[in-house]
């Protein structure tokens, strides 16, 4: 059975839950202290000058709070927020419709901004830099360009793959911030707060047990909390105890390091099938039956963070930690005799 408890992509139910528990002010946002402190300064200064906040780029693994921060920025600036994503804006005309509806101080949040089409991205340059866009009227020989002025707005872009952003787009963001994984103590406080909103009690040690297995990601921590609530309620328990938390995590096949079934498949494939690597992404994806993008964006960041995996120019390589844990007895942990070339 494939377990999806550690997938960092939100489903519709989860999106509604995140809306319910989302912090409304900078002071309520847990973690990312340096980033938050800097944003407070930038927002306060922009408000004192009566100006729109500089455009903000938020990067980092999924599920760490980029969308939440965009909402908080809009609230702190006293503007409205319009939400879209890179793949949804497939034509410059779609972007023009969004931009012309913005009022002074509004926030345009583009998730997965690295997936903007090149033509749409170029159309965004003048909007970000000069608050203007050029619209082409009619077609053929009678066509003419009309320049439209825009109200000063703030673009907040979110990306899990900052390296895919073009230099011209990246250069137009005045504020560039990266979100990092959370430590267990911060996740514990997030879990306890969310449990209060869900009207279910949770023991501190139970919250810490869930936190330790949440891959440093609030979205996963909140998802595991909801599953633990299910186990507690079915068992007739009024609150989530340590025993309930452990039973939940064991049932979801999440080990003490936060690794799930697919994490283990990836590491076992590299260690056992490819003798530790290097192995190309395409070969690895076929081996474990998962999409390349999912491996690269969802699974690899945490495996690298935890010291199980390295990316090299020739492919993915298992570290000594991974070799010692996942190698069959008798297999060397020194790496491959024959290197596998990178193919993705």
UniProtKB/Swiss-Prot annotation:
**Coiled-coil residue windows:** none
The protein's annotated catalytic reaction(s) are: ATP + H2O = ADP + phosphate + H(+)
What ranges does the record give for the region Head domain (RuvB-H), renumbered to this chain? 256-344
Enzyme class (EC, first level): hydrolase
Enzyme Commission code(s) on record: 3.6.4.-
Listed binding positions for ATP are 21-22, 63, 66-68, 129-131, 172, 182, 219
**A GO BP entry:** DNA recombination
Give binding positions for Mg(2+).
Answer: 67
The protein's matches in InterPro entries, at most eight in alphabetical order, are given as:
AAA+_ATPase (IPR003593), AAA_lid_4 (IPR041445), DNA_helicase_Holl-junc_RuvB (IPR004605), P-loop_NTPase (IPR027417), RuvB-like_N (IPR008824), RuvB_C (IPR008823), WH-like_DNA-bd_sf (IPR036388), WH_DNA-bd_sf (IPR036390)
CDD domains, per database record: AAA
Alphabetized GO MF terms: ATP binding; ATP hydrolysis activity; four-way junction DNA binding; four-way junction helicase activity
Q: Which GO terms describe its cellular component?
A: cytoplasm; Holliday junction resolvase complex
Residues annotated as binding DNA: 311, 316
Where is the stretch described as Large ATPase domain (RuvB-L)? Answer: 1-182
The record's region (Small ATPAse domain (RuvB-S)) falls at 183-253
**Record keywords:** ATP-binding, Cytoplasm, DNA damage, DNA recombination, DNA repair, DNA-binding, Hydrolase, Nucleotide-binding
**Subcellular location, record wording:** Cytoplasm
Question: Known HAMAP family for this protein?
Answer: DNA_HJ_migration_RuvB (MF_00016)
**Family classification:** Belongs to the RuvB family.
Quaternary structure and partners = Homohexamer. Forms an RuvA(8)-RuvB(12)-Holliday junction (HJ) complex. HJ DNA is sandwiched between 2 RuvA tetramers; dsDNA enters through RuvA and exits via RuvB. An RuvB hexamer assembles on each DNA strand where it exits the tetramer. Each RuvB hexamer is contacted by two RuvA subunits (via domain III) on 2 adjacent RuvB subunits; this complex drives branch migration. In the full resolvosome a probable DNA-RuvA(4)-RuvB(12)-RuvC(2) complex forms which resolves the HJ.
Q: What does this protein do?
A: The RuvA-RuvB-RuvC complex processes Holliday junction (HJ) DNA during genetic recombination and DNA repair, while the RuvA-RuvB complex plays an important role in the rescue of blocked DNA replication forks via replication fork reversal (RFR). RuvA specifically binds to HJ cruciform DNA, conferring on it an open structure. The RuvB hexamer acts as an ATP-dependent pump, pulling dsDNA into and through the RuvAB complex. RuvB forms 2 homohexamers on either side of HJ DNA bound by 1 or 2 RuvA tetramers; 4 subunits per hexamer contact DNA at a time.
In the record's own words, the domains note is: Has 3 domains, the large (RuvB-L) and small ATPase (RuvB-S) domains and the C-terminal head (RuvB-H) domain. The head domain binds DNA, while the ATPase domains jointly bind ATP, ADP or are empty depending on the state of the subunit in the translocation cycle. During a single DNA translocation step the structure of each domain remains the same, but their relative positions change.
Its recorded name reads Holliday junction branch migration complex subunit RuvB
């Amino acid at each position: 059975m494939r377990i999806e408890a550690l997938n960092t992509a939100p489903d519709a139910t989860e999106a509604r839950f995140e809306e319910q528990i989302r912090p409304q002010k900078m002071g309520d946002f847990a973690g990312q202290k340096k980033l938050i402190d800097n944003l407070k300064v930038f927002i306060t200064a922009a408000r004192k000058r009566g100006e729109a906040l500089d455009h903000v780029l938020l990067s980092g693994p999924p599920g760490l709070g980029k969308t939440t921060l965009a909402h908080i920025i809009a609230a702190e600036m006293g503007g409205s927020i319009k939400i879209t994503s890179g793949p949804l804006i497939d034509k410059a005309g779609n972007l023009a419709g969004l931009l012309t509806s913005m009022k002074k101080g509004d926030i345009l949040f583009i998730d997965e901004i690295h997936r903007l089409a090149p033509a749409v991205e170029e159309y965004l340059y003048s909007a970000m830099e000069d608050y203007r866009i050029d619209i082409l009227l009619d077609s053929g020989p009678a066509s003419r360009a009309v320049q439209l002025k825009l109200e000063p707005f703030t673009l907040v872009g979110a990306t899990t793959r900052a390296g895919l952003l073009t230099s011209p787009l990246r250069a137009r963001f005045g504020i560039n911030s990266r979100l990092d994984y959370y430590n267990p103590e911060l996740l514990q406080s997030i879990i306890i707060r969310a449990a209060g909103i869900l009207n279910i009690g949770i023991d501190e040690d139970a919250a810490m047990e869930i936190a330790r297995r949440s891959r440093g990601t609030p979205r996963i921590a909140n998802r595991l909390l909801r599953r633990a609530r299910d186990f507690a309620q079915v068992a007739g328990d009024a609150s989530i105890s340590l025993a309930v938390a452990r039973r939940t995590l064991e049932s979801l096949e999440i080990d003490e390091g936060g690794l799930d079934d697919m994490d283990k498949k990836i590491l076992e494939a590299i260690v056992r099938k490819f003798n530790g690597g290097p192995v190309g992404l395409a070969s690895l994806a076929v081996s474990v039956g998962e999409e390349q993008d999912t491996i690269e964006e969802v699974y690899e960041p945490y495996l690298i963070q935890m010291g199980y995996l390295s990316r090299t120019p020739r492919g993915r390589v298992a570290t000594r930690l991974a070799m010692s844990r996942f190698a069959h007895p008798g297999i060397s942990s020194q790496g491959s005799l024959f290197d596998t070339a990178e193919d993705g």
